[in-house]
């Protein structure tokens, strides 16, 4: 996510910090120059030169522009900080929404896959049990047929044995000469008895197999019933999971739509932030321009102070030279001295006459600037009058 450029914020703090010192300088310049419009010297009023008045107006204009830029910079800084917080909150919200949607979807898919695997395993196991049951059913049917056959064979052997025994008894009663035939019949009867015993044993074994197969079949049928119940429950759970998955997908689409909306808002906020940062950069450029203008005004003021000092020095040296021209002996010099003195008088009282700025008159720059400009105005007016 986008982060606020620390250089931009540093520039904003620097702009706010530098504003205070420059604003003080401009206040000094504007106030000092504005109050040089009229200078009283006893009963006369000296009008400041147009250049001084123009500089005062320019200083006031620069000061007002500076105040407007200060407010604009503060507003831009507050807006940028607010938008940076909004961008961070929206970024976190988008990430949380996406993470929540992915988690729900993943959980639903995992549960659905697990249930599908469980249903598949139960279906395979049920099929195997049914095959085993069919095998036992076939075994039971075969054993039943064999038992029936053995029972028929046993019944036939019993009938034959009974017939042989009856025939033997009849021969015994008829004649002793039929001893051999009786022995033969007795041998056949013994064979039939052996066959009958073998058939009974086989019949017992077949019955045991039949009972085992029947019990196993019942057991498998019970397992099949249990598996079918589990399968039905798993299918119902699968239906519920599918519904949950559909709901999760719908929620995911909803969250994705919300995320898309938030991303659009985020892009719009980023664009607005970029515009504000561009305005802040323009404000910084305007600040540099105003600082340059303030510096130029300070340099002009210093130059005027130098000119004033030079004029005062020239005036002082001119006043000390004696007038050697004969025709000029009666030129009055006292008015000049009076004017000079009257010019000095306001300079001495300037500190008391300066407008109140909310502070005591202890600012050396303010005192020097105001005195210099006022003195410059008076001396220049005096010089212009003497030249005329």
Swiss-Prot record:
A motif (LPXTG sorting signal) lies at residues 354-358. D repeats lie at residues 288-293, 294-299, 302-307, 309-314. Residues 1-41 form the signal peptide. InterPro entries: LPXTG_anchor, M_anchor, SMDRR, YSIRK_signal_dom. Residues 308-362 are annotated as: Disordered. One of its GO terms (molecular function) is IgG binding. GO terms for cellular component: extracellular region. The modification Pentaglycyl murein peptidoglycan amidated threonine is found at residue 357. Residues 358-388 form a propeptide. It is a peptidoglycan-anchor. Residues 322-332 have a biased composition (Basic and acidic residues). Residues 334-362 have a biased composition (Polar residues). It is found in: Secreted, Cell wall. It comes from the Bacteria. Pfam families: Gram_pos_anchor. Keywords: Cell wall, IgG-binding protein, Peptidoglycan-anchor, Repeat, Secreted, Signal. Binds IgG molecules of the Ig1, Ig2 and Ig4 subclasses, and also binds fibrinogen. This is Fibrinogen- and Ig-binding protein. The gene is mrp4.
């Amino acid at each position: 996510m986008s982060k606020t450029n620390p250089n931009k914020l540093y520039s904003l703090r620097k702009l706010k910090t530098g504003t205070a010192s420059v604003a003080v300088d401009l206040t000094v310049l504007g106030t000092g120059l504005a109050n040089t419009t009229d200078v009283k010297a006893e009963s006369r009023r000296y009008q400041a030169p147009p250049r001084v008045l123009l500089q005062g107006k320019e200083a006031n204009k620069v000061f007002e522009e500076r105040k407007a830029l200060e407010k604009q910079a503060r507003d831009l800084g507050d807006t940028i900080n607010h938008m940076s917080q909004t961008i961070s909150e929206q970024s976190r919200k988008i990430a949380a929404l996406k993470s929540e949607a992915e988690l729900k979807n993943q959980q639903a898919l995992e549960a659905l896959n697990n249930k599908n695997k469980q249903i598949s395993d139960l279906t395979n196991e049920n099929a195997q049990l049914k095959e085993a049951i069919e095998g036992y059913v076939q075994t039971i049917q075969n054993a039943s047929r064999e038992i029936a056959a053995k029972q028929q064979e046993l019944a036939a052997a019993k009938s034959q044995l009974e017939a042989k025994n009856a025939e033997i008894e009849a021969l015994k009663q008829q004649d002793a000469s039929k001893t051999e035939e009786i022995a033969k019949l007795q041998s056949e009867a013994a064979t039939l008895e052996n066959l009958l015993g073998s058939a009974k044993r086989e019949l017992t074994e077949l019955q045991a197999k039949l009972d085992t197969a029947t019990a196993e079949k019942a057991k498998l049928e019970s397992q099949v019933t249990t598996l079918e119940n589990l399968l039905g429950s798993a299918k119902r759970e699968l239906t519920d999971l599918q519904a949950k998955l559909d709901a999760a997908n719908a929620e995911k689409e909803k969250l994705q739509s919300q995320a898309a909306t938030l991303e659009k808002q985020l892009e719009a906020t980023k664009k607005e932030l970029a515009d504000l940062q561009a305005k802040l950069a323009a404000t910084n450029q305007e600040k540099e321009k105003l600082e340059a203008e303030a510096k130029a005004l300070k340099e002009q003021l210093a130059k005027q102070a130098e000119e004033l000092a030079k004029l005062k020095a020239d005036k002082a040296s001119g006043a000390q030279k004696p007038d050697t021209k004969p025709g000029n002996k009666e030129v009055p010099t006292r008015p000049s001295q009076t004017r000079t003195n009257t010019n000095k008088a306001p300079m001495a009282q300037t500190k008391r006459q300066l407008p109140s700025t909310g502070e005591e008159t202890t600012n050396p720059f303010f005192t020097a600037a105001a005195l210099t400009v006022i003195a410059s105005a008076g001396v220049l007016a005096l010089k212009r009058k003497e030249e005329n």
